[in-house]
From Swiss-Prot:
Pathway: Antibiotic biosynthesis. SUPFAM superfamilies: Tryptophan synthase beta subunit-like PLP-dependent enzymes. It is an enzyme of class 5 (isomerase). Pfam families: PALP (PF00291). It comes from Nocardia uniformis subsp. tsuyamanensis. The keyword Isomerase applies. One of its GO terms (molecular function) is isomerase activity. Signal peptide: none annotated. The keyword Isomerase applies. Gene3D superfamilies: 3.40.50.1100. This is Nocardicin C-9' epimerase. Keywords: Antibiotic biosynthesis, Isomerase, Pyridoxal phosphate. It catalyses: isonocardicin C = nocardicin C; isonocardicin A = nocardicin A.
Amino acid sequence: MGALPRVPLITAPTRLHPVDGLAPRRVLVKRDDENSPVFGGCKTRALEFVLGAARAAGATAVLTSGTAGSNHVAATALHAGRLGFRVTALVLPQEPGALVARNLRLAAGAGARLEPVPDGVSVHPDRERHRAAVAELRERGERVHVIPFGGADPVAGVAHALAGLELAEQARGLPGPLRVHLPAASTLTAAGIAAGLALSGLPFQVTAVDVVGSSSTLGPGLLGRAREVAALLGGPADAVRPEHVRHVGYAGAPYGVPDPEAGRCADLLREAADVRVDECYGAKAFHHLLGEVGDADGTHLFWHTGSTREAGEVFGPVPPELLCYVE
């Protein structure tokens, strides 16, 4: 694989934060929430390559999509805006909450144009709503770069694989196998991390904890995606073996809805180590980790995929249809 276009957005490697007293074994937290003061987390790692491709293509604007409180939409609005791109996001409804309000405020405050899309209307690039948005931007004279829903661009997998290789270097010498837990929707982050760890030769297992709440997201897709990323990096696809990856359901609460048990785990993590995770996604994966850490040997690690930036007084024009999320 030749060198891919990339823009510098993060500071890496991010640290491994030890947490004692919450489980029979020490737990490590991979602090990717600290990789950028603008907006941290796995979405920003991915944007280094996604926005690198946009810049290389000569784009003046990016069009993406996500739910109303999407971490990806907020990250894109902030980072792409700072690089001079005009940002439009097609946003779908979801349950309201503190995380949704924060991300909407950050995206609007960064100047993103947020276009509400009714429930049931597809924003897939092949569908009418998405095609109309592209056509409108082009009519304004923009050169548009499309970023898939939630940032699930194939080049994002490369960013996550490099993160996996980064972790492998940090974890050498720790008791094996390395057991990584993280929240998952599209599973691309988990797939990339698994690919990087597999190519490193380190004994490991990546557990992607589904936060979508739909059985349709579970199945063999994670292994296939991880193998695709490994091949994209020039390695053997079968370096990622079936036992390297797990995609497990989370029964506590549906997508975007806090779960009381997971919320209590988030409180414990904050009290024990001053590490803050959101209750909708990160807390669910951490809850799952705590339920397994006593039964399996090795080193248990929670990958903090979110951003802990507060919205503060940042605010921009929010479409009337989205005001219900921030009021």
